[in-house]
UniProtKB/Swiss-Prot annotation:
This is 3-methyl-2-oxobutanoate hydroxymethyltransferase 1. It catalyses: 3-methyl-2-oxobutanoate + (6R)-5,10-methylene-5,6,7,8-tetrahydrofolate + H2O = 2-dehydropantoate + (6S)-5,6,7,8-tetrahydrofolate. Catalyzes the reversible reaction in which hydroxymethyl group from 5,10-methylenetetrahydrofolate is transferred onto alpha-ketoisovalerate to form ketopantoate. It is an enzyme of class 2 (transferase). NCBIfam families: panB, PRK00311.1. Mg(2+) binds at residues 49, 88, 120. It comes from Pseudomonas aeruginosa (strain ATCC 15692 / DSM 22644 / CIP 104116 / JCM 14847 / LMG 12228 / 1C / PRS 101 / PAO1).
Amino acid sequence: MSSHRPQHRLSVPDIQRRKGAGSLVALTAYSTPMARLLDPHADLLLVGDSLGMVLYGMPSTLGVSLEMMVAHTLAVMRGSRRACVVADLPFASYQESPRQAFRNAARLLADSGAQAVKLEGGEEMEETVDFLVRRGIPVLAHIGLMPQQVNAMGGFKAQGRDPESAERVRRDGLAMQRGGAFAVVIEGVGEPLARRLSEELAIPCIGIGASPACDGQVLVSEDLLGLSGEQVPRFVERYARLDREIDEAARRFAEDVRERRFPEARHCFAMRE
């Protein structure tokens, strides 16, 4: 009998237990090849609606559909074995009512195999989060800078940098915890506020443009790989410049084709005798 054991996929309770027990690593993934590469290094793979901007060139995340989220989450599930996979509920798929949120969240999980959904919002979404969690759908909350509210916020602007705004974000975090979210993404807020929330909340706080004191960090993978162009948010660290490597590879290929150096004999199939 083979001694090989299937690799354990991290679960929602596994993520919850990481509060105060080492930093969580979260990365976005939208495809099978990227998920396969990131899976050994990430605790959470987030299939974010950011795919609308990153992959499809949309100006915001508002044009992403539930069908797109199902398809890309399926691709990530096929490429991963270890990480807990969380899929975003896209704009207008959950804000109308808790029942609408349940219907679409249930479809997203059932059709993709993901472990949890992520939704944006604070106090106004507490009832919805509670409704989902009580019916078996784990929720990762998202507070602070919320991309689906880009029009209401007047752009992608940092939040919680004045006392009034900070208190509003703090109340949002507490509301998401009361609603039963297993963790919360805190995006684009003042560092002292993110630090305070990480200390005050009993659930893991995952920062993006927040604070090193958070229980984990998440970045858009294309940003850290250098595939997002020259303009990136100030909180991004580029760990590679794959854009330059891709440009060089494409240049060399084009040159070899035009000079008839590619393909060579070793790339071609011989006739059978």
